[in-house]
Design a protein with these regions (language model features):
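Accessible peptide chain termini
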Residues: 1-3, 532
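N-terminal amphipathic/hydrophobic interface segments
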Residues: 3-253, 268-271, 276-287, 346, ...
Length: 867
């Protein structure tokens, strides 16, 4: 085969590299594997503080390992307790289930030169060459020989052997007897401190063989019957022949490769040949067979895989699963590394109960104009959806100014063919972040902020989906949200007035809702809202007092088309309202040093803060003012101190109320807030009269429910968040809570609940429970589960449970999921069973669908370590 010949034939014989593959290690390879095990640092063995020299003969080499069994999976040792462990790699924190870590041997001299070489991209041949041996001969013309404990160092490369012979005319050298060839690669300036860090090293290989030929004036080398280990990839194997043809390229023939422990590896790849390029970060295997426990599982004529964390073109790990609607499905994504600043992924999906589907994603990054991504999918004539075509499109672009870092912009476009799309297809992560939304926003907006101004300019429209909740009919145009074409919002603070805080809000928008179905007459208008507030804060250690006065103005004007269509008079064409507002906010601080219970906590301080706020604003009739996008806020503790229950600028509330509350906090000696509890209530001195719509009743209950909230961290691994409200008659208004317990870095438990009664804020009854658990079982197996239970419907709205197995070299996930489409009122859930397999070194453990689902649903999941 062209381009795969060695640079020079080794000094002694050996069969051709093109003979029939033989993947069982021969005697020479067996000996090389045993010696290679000397550089596998067991987890429970500390790194040596003094250097031990390399064995000088095969007898010593064999003594470095014990209990060798020739019938093990690859003839590797069963007991790794080497006496020869030389390492320049710092102590490495190993992934769980790994018995050890591949480490570089140390150099007995010129270590500073080797470290400097690893941090530069200079050719290795440009560094000086150093050598030492027990005996040397040099004829000053054509021949040089070193023998007896030979060590040769040049830049990033080390060679140790019993004998080295050099042809001075062509620069070809031959190393014989217990040969060790080490290339530490380029690691940059960042030291290796963890098992994940070593993947940042480009290149890096340990080679053990009985004889090696190499060129002294280049990076070329050839070894036969060789065992090798990649420190950056934490992989090892053996080969009939290994050729290093440049600084970054390796050609390996008749090879076994695995990232598992060297003792009975769970999986391995046997290949006719493998090409590795550390410049591109990829490997190419031809005639490859994946074996699990020596059983052939998959044959691949060609396989492209990563050797580090850089992105390059190639197949990603396929996904396989089963669902009640789609049946068996298989997704085989292919990644295109088109350029450093843009790439693409194309994913064909095959379903047993549907037609094939094609999904594509394109990502790009520009120098001055931001970054974005486009994701689209198409499935023709879906057999599970009345033979209708199914499709989706998502586009997002983000930009941030380099000259003005606080200036940014974003563009978003979303489209799906039907409301069931999210329920049926969960392969498009960009769209999945939106959830089951009835109205999908499409917008262009720009943002700017500084110390005194926050500004937003936005154009926004929506795609409104049909839903069973609307009778499975198209939503009437009159019930769709208004477009904002455009909206400009300013929040500002005037800086030049001492002692006074002058702040303001200005919001300008044109609202349009096209009516094409005749469901109502179109009512489009411009709206302008302004509010300016002058406050005089008095802050002292004992507390604070803040009087404030505001002037609010709301102006709306219908456009000419709306005026003509609705026959509005001149008086009804526009509406202008001015409303003043007065408030007084005050609070006290009572400090006490020490903890509330010396038995459980020490040090720190306690703080009790009573607070009282009064707000007054007169009533102005707003019956004829349209409501474009304003709604009522939910009842909770922070909302008690807002001056308005309205979220939006279509209403200016009338206020005459008083809000008392008290807060207690304990901060311990190390700065953790162990307890933060508050209780408060709003007292209406006068019934409010401004409402959102004519059919809504005003809030006139005399006083609000008593609202409470509590956050606590009683232990380092336990968190509690509670809040709720009780009506004046003692009945429940609402309560919800969240408990999180994380006893270890690999286990997590969550329990959440919410209960709410229908109230004057337009909120409906709600009762639900959420729970999740992640914990290791044993021997690498872990359980993952999360449920959402709807008490009102007496059903699990979303349930997921599965097991994962993660070892040093592969991961397996099997899980099932049952869930309802929230836009579908039927009682038929979608059920799916999925399986995912990842092989370390050629895939990412946390890139699977299961990790994405758990990350979206489980608080604290992303902080867990791999099991």
């Amino acid at each position: 085969q062209t381009g795969r010949t060695p640079i020079s034939a080794p000094p002694t014989g050996g069969e051709s590299a093109r003979t029939r593959p033989n993947y069982v290690p021969n005697t020479q390879q067996q000996a090389s594997l045993e010696r290679l095990a000397s550089f596998y640092q067991p987890n429970d063995q500390q790194l040596p503080t003094t250097e031990v020299t390399r064995p000088s003969d095969s007898a010593d080499a064999s003594s470095t390992v014990t209990n060798t069994t020739s019938d093990s999976a690859d003839g590797v040792t069963q007991n790794l307790t080497p006496t020869v462990i030389n390492t320049t790699t710092p102590a490495i924190t190993n992934a769980p289930m790994c018995r050890g870590t591949w480490v570089y041997p140390s150099s007995s001299f010129h270590a500073a030169d080797a470290q400097a070489a690893a941090k530069t991209d200079r050719p290795n041949s440009s560094f000086p060459l150093y050598a030492e041996a027990d005996y040397g001969y040099y004829d000053n013309d054509t021949y040089a020989e070193l023998s007896g404990n030979v060590q040769v160092n040049q830049g990033r490369q080390q060679i140790a052997a019993d004998k080295v012979v050099v042809n001075l005319q062509d620069g070809v050298a031959a190393a014989q007897g217990n040969v060790l060839l080490v290339d530490t690669g380029q690691s940059g300036a960042t030291p290796v401190t963890s098992r994940s860090d070593i993947r940042n090293v480009e290149g890096g290989i340990i080679t053990v063989a009985d004889e090696v030929a190499y060129q002294t004036d280049s990076s070329k080398a050839t070894a036969r019957d060789v065992a090798f280990a990649s420190v950056p990839l934490q992989a090892h194997g053996y080969a009939k022949q290994l050729n290093k043809i440049s600084e970054s390229q390796y050609q390996i023939d008749e090879v076994m490769f695995t990232t598992c422990d060297p003792v009975n590896p769970t999986w391995k790849i046997n290949a006719k040949n493998i090409d590795i390029d550390t410049d591109t970060g990829r490997g190419e295997a031809r005639g490859a067979t994946l074996k699990v426990k020596n059983t052939p599982i998959l044959y691949l004529p060609y396989f492209n895989f990563p050797i580090d964390d850089r992105r390059t073109s190639g197949f990603l790990i396929p996904r396989f699963g089963f669902s009640t609607d789609g049946g068996v499905n298989l997704q085989t994504p292919y990644y295109f590394n088109l350029a450093p600043n843009y790439d693409a992924t194309l994913t064909p999906s095959v379903f047993s109960n549907r037609n094939p589907m094609l999904t594509g994603e394109f990502r790009y990054l520009t120098r001055d104009y931001g970054a974005g991504n486009i994701t689209g999918s198409y499935l023709p004539s879906d057999r599970q959806y009345n033979d209708e075509d199914r499709s989706s499109l998502f586009y997002q672009h983000r930009w941030q100014s380099k000259d003005i870092p606080t200036l940014s912009a974003e563009a978003v476009y979303q489209y799906v063919s039907d409301s069931a799309y999210f329920n049926d297809f969960d392969t498009m992560d960009s769209l999945n972040t939106l959830g089951n939304q009835l109205n999908l926003p499409r917008r262009i907006q720009a943002n700017y902020y500084n110390d005194y101004l926050t500004a937003l300019a936005k154009f926004e429209t929506f795609q409104t989906l049909s839903s069973d909740l609307t009778g499975n009919q198209e939503v009437l145009d009159k019930d769709k949200p208004y477009y904002r074409l455009p909206q400009l919002s300013l929040h500002y603070k005037l800086p030049w007035i001492e002692k006074f805080d002058i702040t303001g809000v200005s919001d300008f928008a044109y609202f349009k809702r096209p009516i094409d179905d005749g469901s109502a007459l179109e009512q489009s208008a411009g709206r302008m809202f302004n509010k300016i507030t002058a406050a005089y804060p008095i802050n002292r250690a004992w507390g604070y007092v803040t009087p404030a006065v505001s002037l609010q103005h709301l102006y709306t004007q219908y456009d000419q088309e709306t005026v003509l269509d609705n026959n509005y008079s001149k008086d009804n064409k526009s509406k202008s309202i001015f409303v003043p507002e007065y408030s007084l906010d005050m609070g006290l601080n009572f400090f006490k040093a020490g903890s509330p219970s010396d038995k459980h906590f020490t040090g720190g301080y306690q703080l009790i803060s009573p607070r009282l706020k009064y707000v007054y604003a007169p009533y102005e009739d707003q019956t004829d003012v349209p409501n474009f996008n304003t709604r009522l806020a939910s009842l909770n503790f922070p909302q008690l101190y807002e001056n308005s229950w309205f979220l939006g600028y279509d209403r200016i509330p009338d206020n005459n109320h008083l809000t008392p509350s008290v807060n207690y906090r304990y901060i311990d000696g190390v700065g953790l807030t162990r307890l933060d509890a508050s209780i408060g209530q709003r007292i209406y001195l006068e019934d409010s009269r401004v409402v959102l719509d004519a059919n809504q009743q005003p809030i006139n209950s005399g006083r609000s429910a008593t609202v409470m909230q509590l956050s606590s961290q009683p232990r380092q691994d336990f968190w509690v968040d509670l809040d709720g409200a009780v009506n004046s008659d003692g009945s429940l208004n609402y309560y919800n809570g969240q408990f999180r317990y994380q006893p270890t870095n690999t286990s997590l438990y969550n329990l959440g609940f919410v209960k709410r009664r229908a109230n004057e804020f337009g909120q409906k009854d709600l009762s639900a429970i959420t729970a999740s658990a992640i914990f290791p079982i044993r021997n690498g197996w872990s359980f993952l589960g999360t449920v959402q239970y709807d008490n009102d419907r007496s059903r699990f709205s979303d349930a997921l449970a599965g097991v994962t197995y993660e070892s040093c070299c592969y991961g397996l996930s099997i899980y099932g999921r049952s869930y309802y489409n929230e836009l579908d009122s039927t009682d038929k859930p979608t059920r799916a069973i999925m399986a995912e397999i990842s092989l370390n070194g050629i895939s990412n453990r946390r890139s699977g669908r299961l990790s994405g689902l758990m990350s979206d649903r489980v608080l604290g999941y992303n902080q867990l370590q791999s099991f």
